[in-house]
Amino acid sequence: MSLVLSRMLLDRFFPGAGGVVAGEARPPMDWRETPVAHVFEMDLPGLAKDQVAVEVVDGHILRVRAGGEHEDANNAAKAGKASGEEEEENDGVRWHCRERAAGRRRAAVTQFRLPEDAAADEASARMADGVLTVTVPKRKGKKRHAGNGKAAGDDKPVCCRFWP
């Protein structure tokens, strides 16, 4: 079984096993390449623009963080509680399952390596109707600086959801 297929199965049946921090989820995403840009679209229903952060790390990794505090799952684990079985302080309600995206505090995180021709410093993002669109223009005839190049033996593109 290929590594990609293994990770797909792990992501579907054991969230967090495929390189994602416990308590975080990956949003569904589309990536299309046009003659002038790479365009990424992610479904983030129920989130406002100020609840989403888009950043480029090390000049070639696009990272999107959305939703609640990223420390919530770690804090619950330290307190000895499962994240889905926390008791609400204000009304004494105990949740046994919280899977709906709208209004939950779980964070959504995804990150992946941008292609060699991506001009990450010129990237733009917009949010409309629960869909985040990130547009990264292509460089004309130029590639990234040598210091940000591919690792030795790494000549295949990396898919958006399976990069560790």
Curated annotation (Swiss-Prot):
* Region annotated Disordered, chain positions: 68-93
Main localisation, per the record?
cytoplasm
Q: Is Cytoplasm a UniProt keyword of this protein? A: yes
The alphabetized UniProt keywords are: Cytoplasm, Stress response
Coiled-coil parts of chain? none
Q: Which GO terms describe its molecular function?
A: unfolded protein binding
GO annotation terms (biological process) = protein complex oligomerization; protein folding; response to heat; response to hydrogen peroxide; response to salt stress
Q: Which domain of life is it from?
A: Eukaryota
GO annotations of cellular component type = cytoplasm
Which cysteines does the record link by disulfide bonds?
none
Instruction: Please give the record's induction comment.
Output: By heat shock.
Localisation per UniProt entry: Cytoplasm
Q: Which residues form the sHSP domain?
A: 20-154
Q: Could you describe the subunit structure of this protein? A: May form oligomeric structures.
Family assignment from sequence similarity: Belongs to the small heat shock protein (HSP20) family.
Protein name per the record: 17.8 kDa heat shock protein
